[in-house]
Amino acid sequence: MYSNPNNFFGGNAMGPGAPQYGAGQPQQQQQQQQQPDPFAPQPTGFAQAPLQQQYTGYPGLQAPQGQLQPQFTGYGQTPQQGMATGAPPMPAIPQQYQQQFQQQQTQQQQPQQQQMPFAAAPPQPTQTLAPPPPVKPQATGFSEMAASFHAGGGARSQPSAAPRKANTVPNIRLSFITAPDQAKFETLFKSAVGDGQTTMSGEKARDLLLRSRLDGDSLSHIWTLADTTRSGQLHFPEFALAMYLCNLKLTGKSLPPSLPDNIKNEVSSMVDIINFSIAEESGSASATSTNAPDFGVRQNTATPPVIQHPQPQPSSSQLLQAQMTGFPAQQTGFMGQGLQPQQTGMPQATGYTGPRPPMPPMPTGFGSNLSPNVGPGGMIAPLNAQPTGRPGQWGLVNTPATGLPNIDALQARMMPQQGREQQDYTTAGLQGNAVIPWAITKDEKTRYDALFRAWDGLNKGYIGGDQAIEIFGQSGLEKPDLERAWTLADHGNKGRLDLDEFAVAMHLIYRKLNGYPIPNQLPPELVPPSTRNFNESLGTIKNMLHKESDFRKNSGASLLPQKTGVSYLKNHSFRGTGGASGNRKDATVFKNNDDAVGYRSSARRRVGNASPRPESPASVGSNEELSLDQLRKKIKEKQVLLDAMDFADEKNMEEDDILDRRDRREAEELYRRIRRIQEDIDNHPDASPIGGDSEAERRALKRQLQNLTDKIPELASQVRKTEKAIADARLELFRLKDAKAHPGSAAAIVGTGPGGAITESDRLKARAKAMMQQRTAALTGKKIDVTSDQDAEKRLEEESIKARTEKENNERMVRDVEDSVRDFAKGIEDNLKEGGQDSTTEHEKRRWEDALGVEDEVRDFIYDLQRSSRASRIRSQDRQGGRKATQEPVSAEAPPTARVDSPASISRTASPAAPPAAGGSYSSYKTPEERAAFIKQQAEQRMAERLAALGIKAPTKPGETAAQRAEREQAERAAKLRQAEEEDARRETERQARLAEEQGVPPPAVSQAAKPEGKKPPPPPSRKAAKPDDRRAEEELATKKAEEERLERERGEQERATRELESQAKAQEDELAKEREEADARLRALEEQVRQGKLKKEEEKRKKKAALAEAKEKEAQLAQRRAEIEAARKREEELRRQLEAMDDDSSSDDEGPEQITPQASTPTMNDSHIVNREPERQPTPPPAPVVSPPQIVTSSPPTEGESRNPYFRMMSHSSDASPATAPAPPVAPPVAPPAPPQPEASTNPFHRIAQAPAPETSPVPVTRRRPDDDGWGSDKDEEDEESDDDRPGGKSAAALASILFGTMAPPRPLSATGDKSATSPTVSSPVAPPPESASPPAASPSAPPPPPPMPGSFPSASPGPGAPPPPPPPPPPMPSAGGPPGAPPAPPPPPPGMAPPAPPPPPPAGGPPAAAPAGGRPAGLLGQIQAGKALKKTTTRDKSAAAVAGRVLD
């Protein structure tokens, strides 16, 4: 029965939607708890029993006061008995409670008293009885918490018998001193002031301050700063400030001249709190403080029913005992566990929670709400987004990397739960050692906000002290820690915590659970933004109020503001400067003015609109009160006033007329000045053009500029290509000239490098050729002039350097031109951009140039000014047209006649003819045709100026004679003059008419009639207007006369100035005409000089070309003669050799192929080429020499074989390529079939074997001679082989290779297949096929050699259709070596150089080295060899072979 209402009470009090314990609802709690009559005694008795025991302990400071303890003790016992009737088990509870408290409080009494030395005594509304001593320490913990929450509230709730110390010093922290210092100063202040006093007298303060042993000046300054109220007494904050200043001085720091604003505001605020609290304390001593958890009220009201209702339950005593056992721990914990005592309340809570197992239903209301939230994070998820609005203001930080351990457990424990009152909370499971930052993390804020909303069921926006005791107590911390956390979080000692402050308190608790001490002062990271901003705003308002009070005090305005007229309202603005502004009246300076009469409408008293308005009775007395004389007097006075008004009006009108005339004169003067300035602009040579630049024109110019800029790279590339071609041509020309001047030099070397440069490979080839020539000369016995190629190379290098230098200079010039053009284009583009119009310039242009948005008079003036400016430009252009007439363009779209017909178009199209100084520009033309004509004219003019600077006469227009041009220019000038005269005449007429209208000189009546139109004010009364009209007319006549005289003078001056300008213009025209004639003469002279120079250059070129052609012709003839001589000589040798071969054919029939094959190898071919190249060095290479037709016909077999045999094709290419490198006049190039040049010879050793296979005959004896000497062996080897002369090829490796691989090679080269029909009769002579097949290989190994077979050798060498069949085919078709090496007779041994060519050794050994001995033999050497001369005597080969052997010729 009792548990239900009890539960209902608990549910209401602790539910999320109900106010919490001690939330100012003690009566409601009592009513709910006590359904029967014993309502009043029940709370009284209940509160006295346990509450007073805890209260006895609660006032920890009041331990020495014995009255309080007996008061509580006795009172507690009495109601227990009275309440025992309602609940029998209750009487035993206090005794056990007292025993438990004796054990706990004896341990806690001393520490609690030390922790809260300034705690206020708890309120006790009942009489004091003697309690047991242990209850006092238990209450000490509660008094400590209450002291931290109250600002003197404990004393107010205490009966009058209790001391009033708490009222003297509010529990407010001063920021400029530390907490320990404030505690010391408070103790000292209380000891000096005594009980019940709030201020310290000046004498006591002086005694205390003198103990600091500071000098008098310092103490005087300290007193001045500390006594902020100027009352001669010190409140506690002022005393603390004085002690703080003394400490500053003692530590060696200087005293500030004035207090900082924050210190001054703190001190004044605390002083005001102390002064305001005095009246409240005297008014109601038993009133409880609303700024802290209300422990006293809950003890007196809420707790008794809680204990009484559970008493009927049989198990209540057991539960109470268990709770008791829990309560001591809770109490010790409530210094440590904190908030359970809140539920158990004060000691109330002990009895309340202890005996109340049914109380769980009270949290059952919470339990229902909290059961879903018990799980960690139950309400966190939906509220995660809520703190996101705060981080930017509060500086929330991210969760540390280590996480937030036990935060979920803390949240789960502190959520409203069922049965929390019975639990004994400890820190077990919540403690940790995590790194927790000072600032609140976002995760923490989310959880704390969820916890706050769970407890704030009614959405009041705050958590009261009772709820805080219950919530924080569940953390298991001791009471002092929780009290300090509450004190730091409850800013302003409001007694409740809002959302941010609750988060701060929870964060401090969480830090404490992780081993961090609770600070003495809240760090800046934890100050909520609302608190911080509120403090700043409070400081600002306080400063404003201080300044205002000082201003009022100093100015004396505080005495009688209505008399001084000083308005306080002006100084109340947050944004104002504080100074007086204007004489505006407001409520602070209001004073009634009897003279100020309010408006009173009389319209309702009028009968009709025509009725006069009656005079206001407030200002005029009633007519009935005035006599007739008074009325007449008033009428006279009014008449006088009216006359004065008329005079004033006339005077004002005259003044207005004078001002109007002056303004008109000033305007006319401005007009004249503007016209003069415009004329100066038009006539000045450096004046900027007139006319607006349209955006379309600007864009067109930009596009044109871009197109021209894009052409620059292409032009530069073309210039560079031309420069390169010029340099190459110069080098080639120099080579030709040098070869002509030095025929025997090595300048004939053709460079294969870049740009025709001679590379090292070219030099190696040249040296190899020269050495071959020397060896050939040694063999033939001819003398060859060996010239060093150093001079030629040096000359060519110098010329190359010159050409390269000139090319680089030209390239630099081209780059400079490119850079300058780019800079110029960039400048033009920047000018075009800068000239762009923005909105302001466009508006100004439309207003002052297009006359939009101006008055009619100004618009007419603008149009007239534009017309005069245009006419002036035309005249100036015509004056200067004599000099620039040749450059005036004729627009293709508008012929001259059209220009004459259309003056406007004339003025626009003719202006381009004027130079820029005349004022015309591209922007002054409105149509595309005019602009195109202007651009064309400007381009022609600039081109003419440049040509004139170069001495070249400017070209005239095509299709226009001088007479036509003169007529056109004359017609244009006449049209311009006529148009200008018409414009001047019309402008002068308009000006005269305008002056006549404005001044009214010619027709005075008209001017008088026109004048009053808009200038005269309403005329004055007619009765006195005659005289002013006469005076005004006289003044106007005088003014008009003066103005007319002045105009006449100005007209004369203008005429004189015009005549002077015309004379100056004429003189300028004469000077310009003279200058033009002189320029024409100079141009003609320069043009004649240029023409003569061109003729001379052309004549010189023709002479040079003729001389060069003659020289070439002579050289060609000389080369042709030499070629003919050489061909005849070689033809003779070839015929002689063939005859000898025919004689010996029968004896050497078997060995012929072996002997011929090596003889037809590469050395023979190279030999012949070297011999043939000897005469080629002398002249420059002429065209192909003339050769006999039979020689050309014999070249068909090689051509035939060229299309099938790949090796032969390669060798024929190399032989054909040789003429490209060193063309020789005696050689017949037409003989060689055309093929792409192949300077590189094949290095494949089998290449020669395949090209020179042995015929299918009986093998020749094999020799074991080593081919390492490549046929250039020593004399000893040659002597050993003398006995084998009858077998020329037997002892050579080439012969051995040919024998071994003869069957492996193709049976016959494809080049010789076509010869079977022609050579069939001579099959018995094996000499015929080998020469055919061997002739191609002869050319392949050596790239340098000249064209293939010489003409003299082909008729006999190739038994083609055109060759006579009887003679056997000779050895290889070499021009000069065909005779000797190819001798078929067996007896003569082959020369040493003949054998090596075919074997596999590298081509250098078998190529050019072997060619020297065989190639240089003249025709007479064959007879000597046949006579028995040994070839070993030719020792010169060894010397030359050593120099060239092993070299690879590219």
Curated annotation (Swiss-Prot):
Matches recorded under Gene3D superfamilies: EF-hand (1.10.238.10)
Domain EF-hand residue range list: 214-249, 477-512
SUPFAM superfamilies on file: EF-hand
Keyword entries, A-Z: Actin-binding, Cell membrane, Coiled coil, Cytoplasm, Cytoskeleton, Endocytosis, Endosome, Membrane, Repeat
Purpose of the protein: Component of the PAN1 actin cytoskeleton-regulatory complex required for the internalization of endosomes during actin-coupled endocytosis. The complex links the site of endocytosis to the cell membrane-associated actin cytoskeleton. Mediates uptake of external molecules and vacuolar degradation of plasma membrane proteins. Plays a role in the proper organization of the cell membrane-associated actin cytoskeleton and promotes its destabilization.
Protein name: Actin cytoskeleton-regulatory complex protein PAN1
Domain EH: 181-270, 444-533
Composition skew (Basic and acidic residues), residue ranges: 788-850, 965-997, 1026-1101, 1110-1140, 1265-1275
GO cellular component: actin cortical patch; endosome membrane; plasma membrane
